[in-house]
């Protein structure tokens, strides 16, 4: 991995996954089995359960009032079936452990997703960000949020909890180019500075929430639908880390809104530009691209049709020439060509080099 992308694996994060289908007590016990930990019921207004793992880190299970509660039979259930799993601060190397926790919760009966008004929120540590890097961050989300809305299938059921970036804020932060965090904070709250002390400030319900950054030093990505699929959860985290790394390493990220008539191809090019390259991130790319339409291999799909036809013709001619050299009879099925790439085959990263300028995909 290029040194420009090393930060993807060095940034700390945390994750919240909302779910139902099991009780908070059942969720905590399932997690404890994987974490080799102990469960403590602290109670309180969020009826908190704490699971302490082998590294003495605290995982929490709490109540969340936004979740539509169901039991394991699919029937409406009491609020004891409102479950939000909160991880401790994690590092990239902890992702496999987190995936085991996710699998355990699913096996225990956990269900999640838009039907239950359940989402996943990822927190990225940002106490070392500069004002320019915060500006880069919000510009990335502003420019790519239409892509993200489609790729992540942001549910209309969750729109009140996850909106697109505040256009006025994006306009002002790019006009004023603040050099201190206090100015960014004032722009974020539109001068209503008392909101910074409110836990449930209305400013938090956007795709990239800086309210938590001003309170705790980490920002929150709220666009993800809830998932208990271990591979999807990993892809959500990796995307968040890659965006963070871009905000940290790019000199300037434009707020210009990206558009494309081949969303699947364009989004894949962007993922490669973020550093999600090679077999290590192949499954992540697959999860992030699976809801998008278009030809993944060609910017203009009609070019792909022509290229595949030419390749098929070329290979058939090569086969015909080989038969003639061997003086073999031509079989009746000679019109078929083998190993012609299908439309859905993912091209090599090298085939996408140099296209970001054309697609206005650069940040």
Which functions belong to the PLM regions below?
Residues 116-124:
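Short, conserved phosphate-binding/catalytic loop or strand-edge motifs used
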Residues 1-114, 127-363:
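C-terminal accessory/tail domains of diverse enzymes
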